[in-house]
C-alpha cells in the first residue's frame, strides 16, 4: 500500500485495454476483398486443412480470416464481410468471414446453428 506522498510523486498508471481485433477499427464488421484463398494446418495436437483467406479490408489492413463451415465458394476478388473472433489452433488468424452475406454463400444442408452459417430454414 503506497503512502499518500508516494502517490503524489508518481500517480497510478491507468490500465490500458488493447483491442483483440485492431483491423476492424472499433466497427462490428468490415467489408473486404479476398486476395488469396488457401488452406493451412493447425497447431500441434490437431491435424486438418483449415480454410482461410487473406482479405484486404476497407480500413486498409490486410488480414487472415477463417472461413467457417463445410464447403465454400470464395475465390480471389470475392467481396466478404469480416468479423472479429480468433481461431485457437491457427496462429495469426484473428478474424472470421461472415457466411451468407455479400459474395459468401451460406452452408448447404445445415439444420442446427443455422444463423451462424447463413443457412436458410429447410422447407
Swiss-Prot record:
Q: Where in the cell is it found?
A: Plastid, Chloroplast
- Single Gene Ontology BP annotation: translation
| Statement: the UniProt record of this protein carries the keyword DNA-binding | no
What would you give as a GO molecular function for this chain, any one?
A: structural constituent of ribosome
Keywords (alphabetical) are:
Chloroplast, Plastid, Ribonucleoprotein, Ribosomal protein, RNA-binding, rRNA-binding
Task: Point out the coiled-coil segments of this chain.
Answer: none
What InterPro entries does the record point to?
NA-bd_OB-fold (IPR012340), Ribosomal_uS12 (IPR006032), Ribosomal_uS12_bac (IPR005679)
Q: Is the Mitochondrion keyword given for this protein?
A: no
Cellular component terms (Gene Ontology): chloroplast; small ribosomal subunit
Pfam families from the UniProt entry:
Ribosom_S12_S23 (PF00164)
* Domain of life the protein comes from: Eukaryota
The family classification in the record reads: Belongs to the universal ribosomal protein uS12 family.
Q: Which HAMAP family match?
A: Ribosomal_uS12_B (MF_00403_B)
Q: What does this protein do?
A: With S4 and S5 plays an important role in translational accuracy. Located at the interface of the 30S and 50S subunits.
Q: How does it assemble?
A: Part of the 30S ribosomal subunit.
Identification of the protein by name: Small ribosomal subunit protein uS12c
Organism lineage reads as: Eukaryota, Viridiplantae, Streptophyta, Coleochaetophyceae, Coleochaetales
Amino acid at each position: 500500500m503506497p503512502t499518500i506522498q508516494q502517490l503524489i510523486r508518481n500517480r497510478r498508471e491507468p490500465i490500458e485495454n488493447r483491442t483483440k481485433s485492431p483491423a476492424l477499427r472499433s466497427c462490428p464488421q468490415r467489408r473486404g476483398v479476398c486476395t488469396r484463398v488457401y488452406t493451412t494446418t493447425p497447431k500441434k495436437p490437431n491435424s486438418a486443412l483449415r480454410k482461410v483467406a487473406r482479405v484486404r479490408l476497407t480500413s486498409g489492413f490486410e488480414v487472415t480470416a477463417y472461413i467457417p463451415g463445410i464447403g465454400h465458394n470464395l475465390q480471389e476478388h470475392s467481396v466478404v464481410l469480416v468479423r472479429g473472433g480468433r481461431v485457437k489452433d491457427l496462429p495469426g488468424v484473428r478474424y472470421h468471414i461472415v457466411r451468407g452475406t455479400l459474395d459468401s454463400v451460406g452452408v448447404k444442408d445445415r439444420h442446427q446453428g443455422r444463423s451462424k452459417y447463413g443457412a436458410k430454414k429447410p422447407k
